[in-house]
Amino acid sequence: MRRLLLNCAVTASLAAPLQAQADREADLLRQLSEAETPEAARRVESELDALWSQSGSAAVDLLLKRGQDALEAGDPEAAIGHLTAALDHAPGFAAARVARAAAYYATNRIGPALDDLREALLLNPNHTEALTGFAVLLEEMGREEGALELFRRVQAMDPQDEAVAEAVRRLAVRLEGTAL
């Protein structure tokens, strides 16, 4: 009996931080959808990015940061190396998959980019950057209906994102015609 109670206590102590993170994510996504200005939306996006960039391992978080820094410095090959190392240790880390997809895209490796975005969305279906990246790739591949659907989904989540709004307008006109 004592062992059962100990197991329950350990399980509860491990589940509490996960629930707190899920609650925080839900609150931030609500704030993002209700943001009244682009500036407010960007602040919430930054908080979401910070939340999603926490793997639970300082070493994996450092590899993510190094990968992002390498990508920003114009070295996508180094980024792929760092991010692949992060994913070797934490294959369920959606933020690392999204970042590696961007690095693959920068090196014209569209197949691996799509694979990483697909996996990221299975792990975190609310990841706006993954949704947007997938929509961009679909549009580039001529799959405009799918791209429009994803852009509209992102627009519902982040109505202040002007680039997404422009993509929705552009694709809607092309696919649905102009409104009278």
Enumerate the language-model features and the residues they cover.
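N-terminal leader/linker segments that initiate helical-solenoid repeat arrays
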Residues: 18-65
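Alpha-helical adaptor scaffolds
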Residues: 57-129
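Bacterial N-terminal signal peptides
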Residues: 7-15
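Register position in tetratricopeptide repeats
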Residues: 72, 106, 140-141, 173-177
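Terminal, low-structured helical/coil segments at or just beyond the last alpha-helical repeat
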Residues: 34, 43-44, 50-54, 149, ...
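Positively charged n-region of N-terminal signal peptides that target proteins for export
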Residues: 1-4
